[in-house]
Amino acid sequence: MPRRPKYERRTIPPDPKYGSELLQRFINKVMKRGKKSLAERIVYSALDIVAQRTGQHPLEVFQRAIHNASPLLEVKPRRVGGATYQVPVQVEPHRRVSLAMRWLIQSARNRSGYKFVDKLAAEIIDAANNTGATIKKRDDTHRMAEANRAFAHYRW
């Protein structure tokens, strides 16, 4: 029986421009040192660029990018008799979205270019089209889980 209490997830109010809770979570992930207005400006500018380049509604493109980048499986280390096995496990829905957002931001930061807004917009478009570094990261995670499928019976 767990000793710690089970905590409720905080409800995040939707963002003011699009009314999306998912987008508000993304803004919070982009934010550094509590500068939320800067993070909002960056994300909204990136979405404007996405709308300009694709000609589609930016929120739909963003949601498609998050959906495409979300991993279904990941590996977790499990120690059994002195050996550590990488055990494939299913990813919880909330963590799935969080990982997709984190990978999207990391990939945008690692991209070559000058402005983060442009890099983020390009990465969102790539992820929506099932290409780019974010999708590669998801595929690598799935590949690791598939390679360690033999240890799936060690799940807890």
Curated annotation (Swiss-Prot):
One biological process term in Gene Ontology: translation
CDD domains to which the protein is assigned, alphabetical: uS7_Bacteria
One Pfam family named in its UniProt record: Ribosomal_S7
Keywords: Ribonucleoprotein, Ribosomal protein, RNA-binding, rRNA-binding, tRNA-binding
MF term (GO), any: rRNA binding
PROSITE patterns in alphabetical order: RIBOSOMAL_S7
Gene Ontology CC annotations of this record: small ribosomal subunit
Function comment: One of the primary rRNA binding proteins, it binds directly to 16S rRNA where it nucleates assembly of the head domain of the 30S subunit. Is located at the subunit interface close to the decoding center, probably blocks exit of the E-site tRNA.
Family according to the record: Belongs to the universal ribosomal protein uS7 family.
HAMAP family per the UniProt record, alphabetical: Ribosomal_uS7_B
Assembly with partners or alone: Part of the 30S ribosomal subunit. Contacts proteins S9 and S11.
Name of the protein in its database record: Small ribosomal subunit protein uS7
Annotated organism of origin: Thermomicrobium roseum (strain ATCC 27502 / DSM 5159 / P-2)
Designated gene of the protein: rpsG
